[in-house]
Structure formats: C-alpha cells, structure tokens
C-alpha cells in the first residue's frame, strides 16, 4: 500500500504534466479553453482522476470531453515518461463542478441579501400592532365599594379552575 503523501505528490505532478501536455503537445482546437483544476490518485497509484473546467456552453463541454477521451493515450504515455513510477496510472477525466456550485451559491447569497434588505426596509417603516401597551390592564370600577380584594381573589380562582359558564 502506498503512502498517502506519495499519492498526493503524484497527483499534483500528474495535474502539472497533463496541463502542460494539453498546452504544448496536444494540438486539438477543442481543448483550447480547458483548465486542469485538480487530480486525485488512488492509494495503490494505479488510477488517476483528473478534474477540468471548460469555458463555454454545454456543446463546448461535450466536445471537450470527447477531445480529452481521444487524447488520453498521449497524455498517459507522457505521464508515464515523466513520473518514473512502476505502473503508469490510468487517466480518467471528470468535469469539475466546483465553479458551477460556487456560482450557484453566490446567486443564493445575493438573493438572501436582497431578502434581508427588504425585511430591513419593511421593519424600518413598520408600526406596532395594537395599543402602545399590548398587555391587558384591569380597570377598576368606580361603583365597587370594595378595595378590589374580592376581584383579585376571584381572578386567581378563575385561573386555577378555568373559565366557568354562567
């Protein structure tokens, strides 16, 4: 089993070799707008996954995938010559979705900022609902001769027993 540090170093070197191979050796015009973003190697150093991005629309993505599939043999032999490992890893090219995900997150954050600004704008012009004092205030009746002790005892009893009809 290989060292994970060695696998990381080999992956970094494979990404460099593939990027320079696409720039200088492979002369396919469909690969003009390709950027190699990352490479990952399995711990046994037999398989490498190379991640790439393409500037363009979906048709450009499809044509780039086909061009990379046709250039895999040339790039693999170049990797084998320049790395010096016993077994040259097989290359698999995968479109990198990180830029698309980042763009989508930026859009969602912008929508959240707009919603927050709208809430802040509505809150600045909002008024309180109801009275200034939203809590119920007991009013004292002027015709009641008691000091309010009976009303207070009655309200405490109502709270304990619950409301009664009649």
Curated annotation (Swiss-Prot):
A Pfam family annotated for this UniProt entry: RBFA
Q: Which PROSITE patterns match?
A: RBFA
Q: Where are the compositionally biased (Basic and acidic residues) regions? A: 128-138, 151-166
Q: Which GO terms describe its molecular function?
A: ribosomal small subunit binding
Q: Where is the composition biased (Acidic residues)?
A: 139-150
- Spell out the residue ranges making up region: Disordered: 122-166
Location, primary (coarse class): cytoplasm
Question: According to its record, what are the GO cellular component terms?
Answer: cytosol
The Gene Ontology biological process annotation of the record reads: maturation of SSU-rRNA
Which controlled-vocabulary keywords does the entry list? Cytoplasm, Ribosome biogenesis
The subunit structure is: Monomer. Binds 30S ribosomal subunits, but not 50S ribosomal subunits or 70S ribosomes.
Q: What does this protein do?
A: One of several proteins that assist in the late maturation steps of the functional core of the 30S ribosomal subunit. Associates with free 30S ribosomal subunits (but not with 30S subunits that are part of 70S ribosomes or polysomes). Required for efficient processing of 16S rRNA. May interact with the 5'-terminal helix region of 16S rRNA.
What is the protein name stated in its UniProt record?
Answer: Ribosome-binding factor A
Species of origin: Saccharopolyspora erythraea (strain ATCC 11635 / DSM 40517 / JCM 4748 / NBRC 13426 / NCIMB 8594 / NRRL 2338)
Q: What is the lineage of its organism?
A: Bacteria, Bacillati, Actinomycetota, Actinomycetes, Pseudonocardiales
């Amino acid at each position: 089993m290989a060292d994970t540090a060695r696998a990381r170093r080999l992956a970094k070197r494979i990404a460099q070799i593939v990027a320079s191979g696409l720039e200088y050796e492979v002369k396919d015009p469909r690969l003009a707008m390709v950027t190699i973003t990352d490479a990952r190697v399995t711990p046994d150093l037999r398989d490498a996954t190379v991640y790439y991005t393409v500037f363009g629309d979906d048709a450009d993505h499809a044509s780039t995938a086909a061009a990379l599939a046709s250039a895999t043999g040339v790039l693999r032999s170049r990797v084998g010559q320049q790395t010096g490992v016993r077994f040259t890893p097989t290359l698999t090219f995968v479109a990198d979705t990180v830029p698309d995900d980042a763009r989508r997150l930026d859009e969602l954050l912008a929508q959240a900022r707009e919603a927050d600004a709208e809430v802040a704008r509505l809150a600045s012009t909002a008024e309180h609902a109801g009275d200034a004092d939203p809590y119920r205030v007991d009013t004292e009746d002027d015709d009641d001769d008691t000091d309010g002790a009976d009303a207070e005892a009655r309200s405490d009893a109502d709270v304990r027993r619950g409301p009664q009809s009649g």
